[in-house]
Structure formats: structure tokens, C-alpha cells
Amino acid sequence: MPPSFFKKRLSPIKPGDPIDYKDTDLLKKFITERGKLLPRRMTGLTARQQRDLTNSVKRARIVALLPFVNPEG
């Protein structure tokens, strides 16, 4: 079997660190320019972190910290 050419990605958020909906700079790293969430295979997050991220982004949108859609896009 040939060696794997793919590197194992490290999660950009350390396991156990809370994902806060008020930290918009962190949340914007995981959102496209059109306002959609990036998938796990692109972000390198665990399933639990992706779930927490999704809930945080939704909460930030509801309290108007993040837009639902990008007005230019």
C-alpha cells in the first residue's frame, strides 16, 4: 500500500474550548463570503465542534451580530 499523501489536519479550535456566539472574528473564519457555513471537510473541525459552531452562528445571526446573508452576494 502506498504511503498517504494527505496530512492529518489539526483542528483550528482546541478540543474543549467553548465556541462563543459573541466571538464574531472566530465565527467569520468558518463562513463563506456569501454567509454560508463551511463544511467539516474544509474546516477540519470535529463533529461536536461543527455542531457547536452551527448553533453559535445561528445564535449570532438571531441577535444581529452576523448577517443572515451577505448583501453584496
UniProtKB/Swiss-Prot annotation:
SUPFAM superfamilies: Ribosomal protein S18
GO biological process, one term: translation
Gene3D superfamilies: Ribosomal protein S18
Disulfide pairings: none
Any one Gene Ontology molecular-function term assigned to this protein's record: small ribosomal subunit rRNA binding
Pfam families: Ribosomal_S18
Cited InterPro entries: Ribosomal_bS18, Ribosomal_bS18_CS, Ribosomal_bS18_sf
Cellular component terms per the entry's GO annotation: cytosolic small ribosomal subunit
Keywords, comma-separated and alphabetical: Ribonucleoprotein, Ribosomal protein, RNA-binding, rRNA-binding
Quaternary data: Part of the 30S ribosomal subunit. Forms a tight heterodimer with protein bS6.
Function text: Binds as a heterodimer with protein bS6 to the central domain of the 16S rRNA, where it helps stabilize the platform of the 30S subunit.
Similarity comment: family membership: Belongs to the bacterial ribosomal protein bS18 family.
HAMAP family tied to this protein: Ribosomal_bS18
Name of the protein in question: Small ribosomal subunit protein bS18
